[in-house]
């Protein structure tokens, strides 16, 4: 979203901060957060493409948890969500530069791409919407398990 707005804080304030309709204190915090992210992107040399190291670290943690959940027999709903999303993930991995990304990175990339299409008010195919639904369900479950894991409430 930062790159889509040209790393320009004025545009970010108009397109991302203002629509959130926050009180003055929270709005100032959000502006500062975006400013810090922009600075980090410049410092890490990812202004044009690539991900911040902090994002790479989170993807690594999520991937580790994802694999542990799939190996365990305690999480059948997660496994079911994964196998429901898997055909879409496989299709994504065959397109473009996606082969070198992890499955989860592919999932996040498609959600980001669809978000950009929506912001541009472009049409989204029915097949893409089906993929997004399955992938969103998978990532939603993974997010819930990640929060539980971080809180020490998840037994794998």
Across the structure, where does each feature detected by a protein language model lie?
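N-terminal interaction modules that seed assembly of large macromolecular complexes
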Residues: 1-48
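Short acidic, glycine/proline-enriched loop segments that cap or flank alpha-helices
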Residues: 3-5, 22-29, 49-54, 72-80, ...
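Extended terminal accessory/targeting regions
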Residues: 21-32, 68-74, 83-95, 113, ...
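Charged, amphipathic alpha-helical oligomerization/scaffolding segments
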Residues: 29-36, 57, 61-64, 84, ...
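Helix-rich interaction surfaces within compact, conserved domain-sized segments
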Residues: 33-36, 40, 46-56, 104-108, ...
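Active-site-proximal alpha-helical scaffolds that flank and shape metal-associated catalytic sites
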Residues: 46-90
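Glycine-rich, aromatic-bearing surface loops/beta-hairpins
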Residues: 93-156
């Amino acid at each position: 979203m930062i790159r889509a707005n040209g790393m320009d804080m004025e545009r970010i304030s108009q397109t991302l901060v203002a629509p959130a309709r926050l009180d003055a204190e929270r709005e100032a915090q959000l502006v500062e957060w975006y400013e810090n992210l922009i600075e980090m992107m410049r410092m890490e040399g990812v202004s044009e493409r690539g991900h911040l190291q902090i994002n790479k670290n989170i993807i690594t943690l999520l991937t580790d948890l994802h694999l542990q959940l799939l190996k365990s027999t305690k999480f059948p709903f997660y496994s079911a969500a994964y196998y429901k999303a898997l055909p879409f993930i496989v299709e994504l991995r065959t397109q473009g530069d996606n082969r070198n990304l992890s499955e989860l990175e592919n999932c996040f990339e498609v959600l980001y791409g669809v978000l950009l299409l929506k912001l541009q008010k472009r049409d989204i195919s029915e097949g893409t919407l089906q993929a997004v639904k399955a992938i969103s369900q998978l990532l939603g479950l993974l997010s819930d398990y990640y929060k539980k894991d971080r809180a020490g409430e998840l037994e794998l």
